[in-house]
Amino acid sequence: MPFLTALVPSERACRERGRRHKTLLDVGRQMALQARRWLPGRDLVLVGDSAFSALLFLDALRRGGVTAITRLRLDAALYDPAPPRLPGTIGRPRKTGARRPTLSKILTEPATIWQQVSVPGWYGTGERRIEITSASAVWHHSGLPVVPVRWVLIRDPENHFQPLALLCTDPARDPTQIVTCLILS
């Protein structure tokens, strides 16, 4: 149920009125963190489309105690977490471990283990059987923060829709719960 809304005027409209432009991600971050202040003891989950799949935005929400679930590109740069730093090591600490295969490669890999799941209320069409695979990783891009995520890869055994990938900033969250949150949004 909507309880907080905000208008996000275009850059041109802000320029015409002599106001500073705030992007959708700026306003979304402010709103989510305001909701966190209003509801400090609650599990707060923000579900958004791929426009909200930005590392700075996701890192700000994660640090603010808000879980985010968004779509993820199939070619996103996912890594293992950084290994522990050995005593006596010089130089800056590593941010990530080894690069993981892309999700598009995992999708076509015959060794990928898929789990069949029934999702109730699939976009208003009733129960839908899908196949998912999931793991935790860190998402990183040069110069941006490292964000620990749980990714979920979804495919339809009946080929009614293209495979899609989701991310959740709570790596411990159950993959089925991540899919259900997206569908119920």
Question: What function would you assign to each model-found segment?
Answer:
Residues 2-185:
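Single, function-defining residue in the core of a domain
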